[in-house]
Amino acid sequence: MKKIFGLLIVSLALAACYSPDPFEAETVEVVTSQTSKMGKLFHVNGMEQTCNPSVSNDVENYPASMLWLNFNRLKVKAPDDGYTMEGVTQHDRLTVSDTAGKVKWYLMVDKDECQFQDPEWSTHGGFIVSLRGNAFKNGKLSCGGALNYGIFAIRMADKKRFWFYDKDISEEATPHLWVDESATPDTSASDSTVEGFFGTDKVRLTYVSDDDEIVFVDFANGGLKKAKKLKKPSGRSNWRIDSPLISPDGNFVVYNVYDNPKTWEAYIQELSENSTPIKIERTAGMMSDPAQPHWFEFKGRLFVLWAEFPSNSQMLNKADLANESVQDGSAGRTVMRELRLTPDAPSDLAFEWIDAAREIAPIPMTGGRSPDGKFLATGTNPAFLLKLP
């Protein structure tokens, strides 16, 4: 990574997944599940550290589940011998597990790969997007130092991969993928083209570049050769961008920018070179600016979901949310607000709020809400799925 040391420290504090030293959770008796007024809370991977929580976007095949990355310890129920429980190394697999701790889907690194990074469920339940890192020394795989990252998509049905870039991508690219929801993946079709792999050419990719700008690729309109960069928010040229997530209609992104571990903002922006980022304002009653914003669509209604944290806190959860003492909002909360988006409109008409923000959980959940509205997901230390009442 081409980062100066100070910015690297900021990134490590925020993301946790980039640290080579796993967080050591206090040794306590693991509560498998707990029911309270806010719903039923389930541990994911016991009390072990996870990162990059992403709630299942396929409630038919992977209900009550989330996608996550591991460190060097696992507390899940392996589905077969391929999911090894010994010799586990940091980010050596992608895991989808459910509220019972059962692994429902997984993908291991290949022999010429070191680790995965930044996995995220796409807007289409049949695909995941992720980074893969590797490095070679004297012709042999070398995972001990800096890695070279690429971006690829995984088709859930057969675990085949489609490479967008196989190298020279930032470790902090946080890619996201939009695929037309009507696409029906055909595992017998050619997987060497976008249309063959995804079942459509209506595919869009976003990621953060080395020079810290959002890159937007529309495969129905020029693909990688016509990739575009979005303008950064005014006055925030030196702030870092984190996790641009594409809206369900494929026309907008929502994301964070941060100056330091305790100072961040959230923006909505149309996927256009000339678009103006629109800040999600902090209004009365909010604990902080929105953290880890996600889209949520339900029966034709569109929402932005985000976490809030107490003053002087980092955008990172280290609390055991199963502890009733923090289920009063003292560790943060989860908020949702309905809005309407209008592409190809002046910035003052591009979106409008339908109602005020409302709390949906008195704990901070940073991994999104399932399409059926029943579950929220979060990591990092530890991770949880919350079934809402």
Report residues per predicted region.
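Positively charged n-region of N-terminal signal peptides that target proteins for export
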Residues: 1-4
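Sequence signature of WD/YWTD-type beta-propeller architectures
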Residues: 20-389
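Alpha-helical and His/Cys-centered functional microenvironments
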Residues: 11-12, 53
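Sec-dependent N-terminal signal peptides
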Residues: 6-10
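C-terminal motif of bacterial Sec signal peptides marking the signal peptidase cleavage site
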Residues: 14-16
